[in-house]
Amino acid sequence: MDRLARRLMVALAALMVACVASSGASSNTIAECFSDNNERRIAGCSALIDNPALDAGTKSLAYAMRALAYALKGALPRAVGDYDMAIRLDPTSSMALNNRAWVLFKLNRLSEGMTDVERSLSLAPSSPHAHDTRAHIRQALGERQAAMRDYEQAMHFGGEHLVKLYQCGLEAAGVYNGPIDGLYTSDLRRAFETCVGQPSCDPLPADEECRAATS
C-alpha cells in the first residue's frame, strides 16, 4: 500500500500548489510536504498546517500527507490522529478515508477500517487503492471470495502496473512463479486464491521490492 499511496503524490502536489497560491506558503515548503524523505515531509507539512491563511481543504491535504509520513515511519497511532484531522476538515476526502482505513487495518482495527474504506469507495468507486484496502481487510476477516473480488477490481481499475505489483508480491510470497508481465492469467488467479487463504500472505510486495519490474 505504501507504493500505491506514493503514486498519488505527484497529482496531489500539483493540486496543493494551485490551492496555496494565495496563502503565502513557499513552493519549497510545498515541495517538502511531498518529499520522499519522511522527516522533510513531516516538517514541510507541519509548516503548511501552521499557516493560518491556508484553506480547510488544503490543510486537510497537508494533514493527510503528514499522516502518510508517520505511517511509513511506523508511527501508526500518530498517523491515525492526523488522518482524523484531515477527515474532520474534509469529510469527502476519499484518499484520507482510504489511507486511514489502511492504518486501522495495520492496527488490527478491522471493523473501523472497513467503515472507512466503504465510505471511501462510496466517494471514489473506481479507486484501485481502496479496493486493495478492502481486499486486505476482507482477507484478514476470512472473507475469501469477497477479498478475491476486491483484488480483481483493484487490478481492473489499477491496470497493468498494479497487476505487475501483485505478480511481484505473490512471487515474493512464494505462491507465484510466472512472468511479471501485467496480465491477469489463470496462474495468477490460482496464486491469489492460495494467498487469500492465508491471513499472513500479502500480495503487495515490500516497498523497495519490484522497483525495476514495475517501473
Q: For the regions a protein language model found, what residue spans apply to each?
A:
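Helix-start (N-cap) detector for alpha-helical repeat units in TPR-like alpha-solenoids
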Residues: A56, S60, S94-M95, P128-H129, ...
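Short acidic, glycine/serine/threonine-rich helix-capping segments at coil-helix boundaries
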Residues: H161, E171-S215
